[in-house]
Swiss-Prot record:
One of its GO terms (cellular component) is cytosol. Residues 401-418 have a biased composition (Basic and acidic residues). Keywords: Cytoplasm, GTP-binding, Initiation factor, Nucleotide-binding, Protein biosynthesis. Residues 607-610 are annotated as: G3. This is Translation initiation factor IF-2. CDD domains: IF2_eIF5B, IF2_mtIF2_II, mtIF2_IVc. One of the essential components for the initiation of protein synthesis. Protects formylmethionyl-tRNA from spontaneous hydrolysis and promotes its binding to the 30S ribosomal subunits. Also involved in the hydrolysis of GTP during the formation of the 70S ribosomal complex. It comes from Stigmatella aurantiaca. Residues 57-213, 225-248, 287-315, 401-436 are annotated as: Disordered. Residues 586-590 are annotated as: G2. Residues 92-104 have a biased composition (Polar residues). GO terms for molecular function: GTP binding; GTPase activity; translation initiation factor activity.
């Protein structure tokens, strides 16, 4: 069963005339005993109907007034008299006319109905007051010149809105006979009735002047005359005595019919030359809903019929025309606008309209203007019915304007080929769009209701202008993406990518482009590039070089050579120290800086590692040094790292001093070494060259003084000077993370003096110098040019090879470091890794690409971490790729383990050990931790891990064959084959293959091997045994059992 909510019941009550809001309806329903709490509560239909009826009985709503069917304005038209009728002369027999018009019926056929009686009771008494009729009616009866006016409506066009004829059943009408002249009309109540108020000027709604009727002789009316129903001051309109004809008067229209009756004291005469009686009152034209069919308006047809329709209407409503028609008076009197007119001769003045008729038309929602089609357009639409009558069918769509107030009609019709009609274009045979709009809608503009739209000025047309040349400037910092560059210049991104392709650069829309490339592209479009980026030089102190400030500084000497050629041992001999004995594996894996005092002055030595993995270290040492000592073993000769050191020294353009070490070894051959060095453009002085070669022995400390003397001599030739008074500038030789001291940087000061408390910046790290230690471990307050020290106080471990600068304050240092970090991030984001054809081929061949070994590298110093990273990346092959996830300095921490676990990688430590928390985390996450102290072992361990990722190669090796002679069924074991070994050997647990009639029947694993109820490991050729096979019992005599085993071998990385 459906339900109704409380708010729906409230709407239903509102339709019955009871205005209650939702809360009041809830209160009413609760008082009636219904369980409702809010407007959303619901009741069943039968309960809701009963509740509505109870509330209606309780409230007893007033009967709603009948709705008005036609709310409109009045359009009045002037209508002339009927054809053939003249101007009625009121002077001709006025008494007779008055008597005929106002004679009451004397012998009605039946009494008036109750409805009529009730209606007459509601009429004000003033409307029924009449004067006693004297001799005027009898005299009027004898006048032959005047006829009783016909009971017809005024001759005028039919009103556009008529009262419905079938609105109510027709009540019986009284039949009125002609009045008897000898029967005077006299009634006692009439004489006692009070005199109605004098009718004064009433304003006319049409705006015309108001008028009042002149006093005249009274026109007697019947006491039951329904014409008096509308004689109250509220329903009467105005008196118009001053108008020349009836058409000059305007009457407001509120009801729906014209009613006329003689006013009190009027004589009923029609003045000659006037268009209306002077003593008549005209009521309004009523357009309300008829209460009965008897209230239909009588209309005078143009045909001149004094039809029953006209007379019948007047008889029912007014009782006016019936008496006149039944009196036997002449029928040539014409009623015009409810006024009797006598036929007279035609007059020129009579051609003017003599009556006014109100036509009620429906009020449209908006005012419209009917547009008459032009002659050319009207010809295209014939009036004949049919499909061809309207010509081509067009569809129009109403489209609102941007403000949502106006409307526009858009032609959306289609041609015969179902395609949209083209907009625009000349067409001689078709009419304009505006004419079609007017014809289709009959209106030009459809404004919305409400506030009037203010007239707007028509905007100027958009003009395309060119940007001034001085404004075509792109302010650029470091780089810009391709899409941003196109947006700034107003060029499509695809066009810029084409330009980049023309320059040989493949870039995407989000890829960063450097400033130089931007200048090339912008110049093609007429733009200029203004570099307004962050400049580090603006934050660095300006230094004016003055010769008088220069001071001599000690030379910086780098010892380079192949591994195990005695570089560190030579430095130990120079420093009188024993560093080599403490190195792991007897090799140097760090770059060391030492300051040595000799008889000829101070010398700063840099010890570089000789292993191939430390190429970058050697390169950095060559770049910051003044002189290179190339150590070559006399018994070993020139080796690969020796050649590499020569290249680094030549690239740095520094002089080379060759030390022929190990001269005390029996197999030393210095001449062969000199010959090999001459092949690399290092010709000794005794051979006519410029290279100094000194034979030395580090263990025997032979030739050390001669070597130092040549180094100092070379430094004097170079004339090494610097300005110690300027802000310090140096180079980072090495960086490490000390557990107690934090980030530590080994700094070689090149210019100025570095002091404790200076704000420094290096790379992306910055800080303030808190402490410094020299090469001997002593704390110092300042470091002069040409010396090195360990600096503590940086924000992070610096990268080896970076430049360190002293700035004004720590804020400036931070800004420089952040700017450099941003540039690095942009550079990383702009990198696009593209696969080569070989890589794609290898990925396809390997079925999805090569395997990947992900590693996290931790080392004791920054240089070693970088060297390990480069060495590991060089191990990448087409089968296994090594990807370094992260590189750091310091002990292995728990975060390193979690990072490796997230990427399913391993952690490699070089000269560091894991913390206790890192070991437990590695066991929990299943991450492998591997620590190394020698670079050789680390590389071998990484290579082994790479091979483990590859699938092993499985090969099959035959063991022997056995023939089934008999079968036995053993409980819990199944079928056992009694077999004899034909060749080879049968081993327990081997894989077996069962052959029957030279076809493989089954392949599986051997379950058991016995000989005389004893389990044996193997059975040799010529012996018998019992063989059981897993999950197979279908054994028959004559079957062959082949035993074999599978060997796995590790794949090679190449």
């Amino acid at each position: 069963m459906s339900k109704k909510r409380v708010h729906e019941i409230a709407k239903e009550l509102k339709g019955h005339g009871i205005e209650l809001d939702n809360k009041e309806v809830v209160t009413e329903l609760a008082g009636l005993g219904y369980d409702v709490k809010s407007h959303s509560s619901s009741l069943d239909d039968d309960q809701a109907t009963a509740a509505v009826q109870k509330i209606l009985d309780k409230r007893k709503p007033k009967q709603a007034a009948a709705p008005v069917t036609a709310k409109g304005f009045v359009v009045r038209r002037k209508v002339g008299p009927p054809t053939g009728s003249g101007v009625y002369d009121a002077s001709q027999e006025p008494s007779q006319a008055a008597s005929d018009v106002s004679s009451p019926p004397s012998e009605p056929v039946h009494e008036a109905s109750g409805a009529e009686a009730a209606a007459s009771e509601r009429v004000p008494e003033a409307a029924a007051v009449q004067e006693p009729v004297a001799e005027a009616p009898r005299a009027a009866a004898s006048e032959p010149a005047a006829e009783a006016p016909k009971a017809t409506a005024p001759v005028a066009p039919e009103p556009t809105v008529e009262a419905p004829k079938a609105a109510a059943p027709v009540a019986p009408e009284p039949t009125v006979e002609a009045p008897k002249t000898e029967a005077p009309v006299a009634a006692a109540p009439i004489a006692e009735a009070p005199t109605p108020p004098a009718r004064t000027e009433v304003p006319v709604t049409s705006g015309r002047r108001a008028a009042s009727c002149r006093g005249a002789a009274p026109l007697p009316c019947s006491g039951k005359d329904p014409l008096a129903l509308n004689s109250s001051p509220q329903s009467s309109a105005a008196f118009c005595p001053d108008a020349r004809n009836p058409g000059d008067c305007d009457f407001p229209s509120t009801s729906g019919r014209w009613h006329a009756w003689p006013s009190r004291g009027s004589s009923g005469r029609f003045a000659h030359g006037a268009g209306r009686p002077s003593g008549w009152t005209f009521a309004r034209w009523t357009s309300g809903r008829p209460r009965a069919a008897s209230r239909r308006t009588a209309v005078q047809r143009p045909s001149g019929r004094a039809g029953a329709g006209a007379s019948h209407g007047l008889q029912r409503r007014k009782g006016f025309g019936a008496g006149a028609q039944a009196s036997g008076q002449p029928q040539n009197v014409t009623m015009v606008g409810g006024i009797p007119h006598a036929p007279t001769a035609p007059d020129a003045r009579a051609l003017r309209p003599t009556a006014t008729q109100a036509v009620v038309i429906s009020r449209p929602l908006i005012q419209v203007r009917r547009v008459t089609p032009t002659t050319s357009s009207a010809k295209q639409y014939p009036m004949a019915p049919g499909k061809k009558a309207i010509g081509e069918v067009r569809e129009f769509k109403v489209v609102p304007d941007h403000a949502g107030r106006g409307r526009e009609l858009v032609d959306v019709s289609k041609n015969k080929d179902k395609s949209p009609r083209k907009r625009g274009g000349p067409n001689d045979t078709s009419i304009s769009k505006q004419e079609l709009t007017d014809l289709a809608w009959g209106r030009v503009n459809i404004p919305l209701r409400g506030k009037k739209k203010k007239p707007t000025k028509k905007g100027a047309k958009t003009q395309i202008t060119q940007m001034a040349e001085d404004k075509k400037v792109i302010k650029l910092q470091e780089g810009i993406s391709v899409s941003d560059l196109g947006q700034r210049m107003g060029v499509r991104t695809s066009d810029i990518i084409k330009k980049l392709m023309g320059l040989g650069k493949m870039a995407t829309a989000n890829q960063m482009v450097d400033a130089d490339t931007v200048e090339l592209i912008a110049s093609d479009y007429g733009w200029k590039v203004d570099r307004v980026g962050f400049e580090v030089e603006d934050y660095l102190p300006e230094v004016v070089a003055r010769p008088e400030d220069a001071r001599t500084r000690p030379p910086v000497v780098t010892v380079m050579g192949h591994v195990d050629h005695g570089k560190t041992s030579l430095l130990d001999a120079i420093r009188a120290a024993n560093v080599a004995s403490g190195e792991a594996g007897g090799i140097t894996q760090h770059i060391g800086a030492y300051s040595v005092t000799t008889a000829r002055g101070d010398i700063t030595f840099l010890d570089t590692p000789g292993h191939e993995a430390f190429t970058s270290m050697r390169a950095r040492g060559a770049n910051v040094t003044d002189i290179v000592i190339l150590v070559v073993a006399a018994d070993d000769g020139v080796m690969p790292q020796t050649i590499e050191a020569i290249k680094h020294a030549k690239a740095a353009e520094v002089p080379i001093v060759v030390a022929l070490n190990k001269m005390d070894v029996p197999g030393a051959n210095p001449d062969r070494v000199k010959k090999d060095l001459a092949n690399h453009e290092l010709v000794p002085e005794e051979w006519g060259g410029e290279t100094i070669m000194v034979p030395v022995s580090a263990k025997q400390k032979m030739g050390i003084d001669l070597l130092l003397e040549n180094v100092v001599l070379q430094a004097e030739v170079l004339e090494l000077t610097s300005n110690p008074s300027r802000p310090a500038v140096g180079a980072i030789i090495e960086g490490e993370l000390d557990r107690g001291r934090g980030p530590v940087a080994t700094v070689l000061v090149q210019e100025g003096t570095l002091r404790v408390g200076d704000a420094v910046v290096t790379g992306t790290d910055y800080g303030r110098v808190r402490a410094m230690n020299n090469s001997r471990g002593e704390s110092v307050k300042e470091v002069l040019p040409g010396y090195c020290a360990e600096v503590i106080g940086l924000s992070g471990v610096p990268s080896a090879g970076d430049t360190i600068n002293v700035v004004a304050d720590e804020k400036a240092a931070k800004q420089i470091a952040e700017h450099r970090g941003m540039k690095e991030r942009q550079s990383e984001l702009s990198k696009v890794s593209r696969e080569t054809l070989d890589q794609l081929f290898a990925k396809t061949k390997a079925g999805g690409g090569p395997k990947e070994l992900r590693v996290v590298i931790k080392a004791d110093v920054q240089g070693s971490a970088e060297a390990v990273k480069q060495a590991v990346q060089k191990l990448t092959t087409h089968k296994v790729k090594v990807e370094v996830i992260d590189t750091g300095v310091g002990a292995i921490t728990e975060s390193d383990v979690m990072r490796a676990a997230a990427s399913k990688g391993v952690v490699l430590g070089f000269n560091v050990k894991p913390e206790s928390g890192a070991e437990s985390a590695a066991k929990a996450e299943g991450v492998m931790l591997r620590s190394f102290s020698i670079i050789y072992e680390l590389i071998d361990g990484v290579r082994s891990s790479m091979e483990e990722l590859l699938e092993p190669i499985r090969t099959e090796r035959k063991l022997g064959r056995a023939e089934v002679r008999n079968t036995f069924n053993v409980p819990k074991l199944g079928t056992i084959a009694g077999a004899a070994v034909l060749d080879g050997v049968i081993k327990r647990g081997a894989f077996v293959r069962l052959m029957r009639e030279n076809k493989q029947l089954f392949a599986g694993k051997m379950a058991s091997l016995r000989r005389f109820k004893d389990d044996v490991k193997e059975v040799a050729q010529g012996f018998e045994c019992g063989i059981g096979i897993e999950n197979f019992n279908d054994l028959k005599a004559g079957d062959i059992i082949e035993a074999y085993e599978i060997e796995e071998t590790r794949q090679s990385l190449t």
